[in-house]
Amino acid sequence: MTDRVRLYEIAREMGCDNREVLEVCEQLGIPFKSHSSTISPEQAELVRSKLSEPRVVKPTRPRLRPKLQPESSQPQPPVEAKASERPQHIVGIRRPAPAQQQAAAGEASSSKPSPQRPDQLSSEKGAAGGSLELIGPPRRQVDPPARPAAQEPQPAAASTRPEAAAKAGSPEPSPAPAAKRPTVLPPPRRAASGPEPPQRAPESRRPGLAEAPSPSGARTSPPVEEKVSLPQAEQRPRPQLVGAPVRPGTRPEPRSPVAKKEESSDSGKADEAPRPQRRLELVGPPTRPVAKPLPPEPDASPRLPEGIPEERPTPVLAEAPVRPAAPKLKRKTVEEEDEELQALERRAGRTQAKRKRSRRREEGDGDVLDLDPLTVLSSVKQAELNALKPLARPTAKPPSYRPPAAAARPRPAAERPQRPSASAEATAPEAAAESLPEEKVLLLEGSLTVQELARRLRVAETEIIKTLFFKGVRVTINQVLDESLAESVAKELGYEVRRPEAEPKAKKTEILDLEDIDHLVPRPPVVTIMGHVDHGKTTLLDAIRHTNVAQREAGGITQRIGAYHVDVDFEGQKRRIVFLDTPGHQAFTAMRARGARVTDIAVLVVAADDGVQPQTLEALSHARAAQVPIIVAINKIDKPGSQPERVKQQLAEHGLLPEEWGGDTPMVEVSALTRRNLDALLEMILLVADVAELQANPNRPARGTVIEAHLDKARGPVATLLVQNGTLRVGDTLVAGAVLGRVKAMMDDRGQRLQEAGPSSAVQLLGLEEVPAAGDEFQVYADEKEARRIAEERAEALRQARLQQALLSRRVSLGSISAKAQEGQLKELNLIIKTDVQGSAEAIQTALQDLPQEEVRLRVLLAAPGEITETDVDLAAASDAIILGFNTSFAPGARQAADDKGVDVREYDIIYNLLDDLRAAMEGLLEPEEVEEPLGQAEVRKVIPISRGAVAGSYVLSGKVQRNALVRVRRKGEVVYQGRLDSLKRFKDDVREVAAGFECGIGIEKFDAWQEGDLIEVYQMVTKRRTLAPA
């Protein structure tokens, strides 16, 4: 098959088109599929010989365009050009004319003399196939300058094939009278003609052009090349042909014979309109100087009456490749045509150079396109151009569209300089760091996000991310870094890290203003009872108040802060003391700190039999941070085994030296049960208060601190407030933290309603919109709008703090994430905490943070005071959470909802039990671990050979030996085998186990290299519940 020849190679060799080669193959009966098909050498020779003979050139090649010669005024022989051009035998019919007139038009066109074609060689093979056989080479570009005159199609020659129509359309050199029919002159350069011919020409040529494509292969070739100029007489009737559809989509219809177009001139016009190429060609005379084949214009006028009546002045475009030399397309509307005619008149007197410039300027105009005859575009490109021109009907659209596009381009260019500036914002901190001569010092106050750290270090976020990436930590811009990781990054970037001194939580706040100095009056002291758990704080307070609060407390421990008033007779006067009772459990650190912050005097209670304990030292640190005087009450001196002197010694070691030892710390030995020395304690409190000269201004809006708060199902949010300055009255508008409220009612610690509360008064307040946070400060405002604005600002700040806290839960550190957490095996336990008061919720959350969370992480979805409601149950069911109720109850329907949805609700009244159960639940989430449990040991005393190996005669040293248990054989301290014990016999009987002190035979299938003295360790693997690693 290597000697076979491809058809396109033959076409290239012969200098012809593939289509011509395919036609020859079809004529010779040579089978083929496409131009890439192969044929035998013999068949190739036949094709070459056939191609070398004169052949009919089909008008399907639109790309070959003979160039017009502006100088030639005489007819030129269209020998090859004629063949190359598609002879468009279209009889232009202005109006529906009878078939006889169409036939007459066809005869006139055929008999029409063409002075330009005397040299043409044309031979008519028949009426059906009247096509011209050109003897010249197949390439039609040989005679580009020769512009064939417009060929007139012969109706008789019209056939279904466009080739036959093209052949028949080519007029013979017979000198038929031109007056009978307006002949479409070849490319007549009628630029010299007056402005009138151009005006009429576009009108008359449009119908003719539109008709021309229909009869002969209009579809095969967009003959835009030739520009035919019609006589003025023919052009005048043309204005009637105005609205042929310009859409090029109708071009495929021209395949129909010429007779069909003659039958309906209107339909022909519609078909012709899609071919904007024809219209462009007809405008040629005014725009391009084309050689005039027929110099006498009067001849054209007599042609009309002789050959065709005025009703049918449609010029017959014999030559299919009529170039749209004057592509002055007449639009469908009459107004557009008038505008085009005016434009033609203005351009008629311009020079050739001006025409070229105007053509470039008017490319966007669909109306006029001036083409220079010397610059002839290819037929394909011209066809595409003409197809696009009619689509842009509004002449102003293209130009109006282009300027905005051009204007849009500079805009992005102008914006581009801004983008670098925007992107430079990321690197701006670096530049600022370089320009600032400040020291590279980072004040690290806690965990930071990557973005915040980059801003403080004045570097780009990408620099931080890159530095961490090299450390093996992948972070995002919003991820939170712990202090150690942020410190390492800062040091690597050359910064010195400093940490601010931690401000104590119990630091006392100043509530007096300068304007209060002139209105100060003495106020009662606020005394906070502090100490370790079970040292008798509440019992001591009950003994002072003559109450029994301690007996009503769950578990006998205080788990909430309380405020009480006590009236004492001192030096013949009634003196009031406000006591704050704080819990002693380690989880209630915040409560103790809050009590120390608002107190005036701290009473440190220490049990004489227990001495100084951790919470004693913590309370001491809070009191010192608040810089308040300390009074030590050594309690339980009546208890056997009490050692008050040892307690004083311990306190002295921590900086509290008793007054009797030469110190400045008052110490009173008391007994709450026997009420011993209680008066001495109260007297000491009042003496210290007098020394401190406690004062306040009662004639100002109240200010103070929220001691405790809770949600009451009947009364709503209830807050215990300590008024530290000013006077609080019913009806006042106040802001407590971020909560707005109006005082609806006030009650003291005994439940009596009050209308006002002065300085150092502890009251329960009703009327707040929400439950405030314990420890928040409150202030009364005269303007409610101002109060609401302040509350909203604080609420927004609180939301941001919560968001920061949520980010902290996703913080990244180098050592806090365990390997299992990195592998996605970190367990999570979701919790919903409901307590009686807000302080208890805070204490529980603080205690949860102390639990180890490297393998099981605790997520507190909600922690708030109040009852357990159905909403809480729904949240727990949706998030698979556990509800922890602390000293609270169920709302109506909540317990039933929890049972229906299977929500686990745990109720507690002692914080110890809550934390113990929570730790157990966390351990339950851990996967149990397998541990080795030893069973016994045996020593090999004798090796007994058997047929299948050897058996170890052993003596059980300790424990027991079980069959199928795991064994480890040690020889001189090294393990020589580890596997399973398969056979265990005592004498000749199989036994399940052998106890210590007995002999037995041990056999293992996969091991028989026993030696005397080997030690056999018997053990088993058991699963054991894991416990949380210490934090």
Curated annotation (Swiss-Prot):
Task: Kindly state which keywords UniProt assigns to this record, in alphabetical order.
Answer: Cytoplasm, GTP-binding, Initiation factor, Nucleotide-binding, Protein biosynthesis
Q: Where is this region: Disordered?
A: 33-369, 388-436
| Entry keyword GTP-binding | yes
Q: Where is this region: G4?
A: 635-638
Gene3D superfamilies attached to this UniProt entry: 1.10.10.2480, P-loop containing nucleotide triphosphate hydrolases (3.40.50.300), Translation factors (2.40.30.10), Translation initiation factor IF- 2, domain 3 (3.40.50.10050)
Region span, G3: 581-584
Report biased composition (Pro residues) as residue ranges.
184-200, 286-299
Transmembrane stretches in the record are none
Q: Which PANTHER family match?
A: TR-TYPE G DOMAIN-CONTAINING PROTEIN, TRANSLATION INITIATION FACTOR IF-2-RELATED
Q: What family name appears in the similarity comment? A: Belongs to the TRAFAC class translation factor GTPase superfamily. Classic translation factor GTPase family. IF-2 subfamily.
Question: What function does the entry list?
Answer: One of the essential components for the initiation of protein synthesis. Protects formylmethionyl-tRNA from spontaneous hydrolysis and promotes its binding to the 30S ribosomal subunits. Also involved in the hydrolysis of GTP during the formation of the 70S ribosomal complex.
Name this polypeptide is given: Translation initiation factor IF-2
Q: Which organism is it from?
A: Synechococcus sp. (strain JA-3-3Ab)
Tell me the gene name.
Answer: infB
